């Protein structure tokens, strides 16, 4: 019996050693190609949506930890196009004059405790078939990317920065050579990053940047903790910046979302978090003055998780605010109605410039589509 047991143990040891030898090195996969299969706990959460305006059947979505996906069938099906790179996505931006040029900022900017990190900015010139890393490796989270429509090699990146600690690679960065080199053009301090940006629809040298100091800890989140959050404007392509706070809360500010009306650059909307008031502000003079227009629940709930505003391309009084329950206004933000029958937690919205009744929403559950200005929605994916 002892001999049999000893023989069995020797055989198992030999097989174990053989298995370890066979499974080591490149022989493990041979000619097979590995693909990303997880973890998938948050990968369905949509962080951003971009659509080719002249051909809205082509849709790109960036997800929290699932990479970038592309549809050429108006959302009937999607395929992954970024699986060899960082899975956490913050922003996808298209050069609408050359829509095969796609910029991706990695690192989800919606900073709940389940968020994952990015590794900088990537660029494709063939619709996502191949990608090139173009910089800002230590950015960790990118909130926005803006392209100068008159000079497509001039690109601005809003770097939100590290969530759990201070870092210096944050603020607003600019390239004038398509990503070969970068200059930081707006920096507050190592705790304050850029949460959102906007470009004037007629003059690309006019820029807006929402700067945000924030820090996450294991047991709580601190928004605006250094008192350096604020809204800034440049009229010279980022060479100089001025704070534009007239009419905004005078107490400590937190996260701010900013949007300009594509049909009228003087009309701006800002979703503002402060210590005493959270709400929607409106400017009719390109940010010189602001007026509080709405303090509904979904205009202030969880600003670290929802802050984007999308303005109708043709009507400056129609806007969608991303929120726990998304809301839409048709009177410049005075009143909002909830958008029902969609998955809760909406982070991105797109309004078709050719048919403004056509709306896409990016939610924690995927992509939803409306053809009647948000009255009804159907799930696309």
Where are the language model's segments positioned?
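Bacterial Sec-dependent N-terminal signal peptides
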Residues: 1-22
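Beta-propeller blade termini and top-face loops
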Residues: 20-381
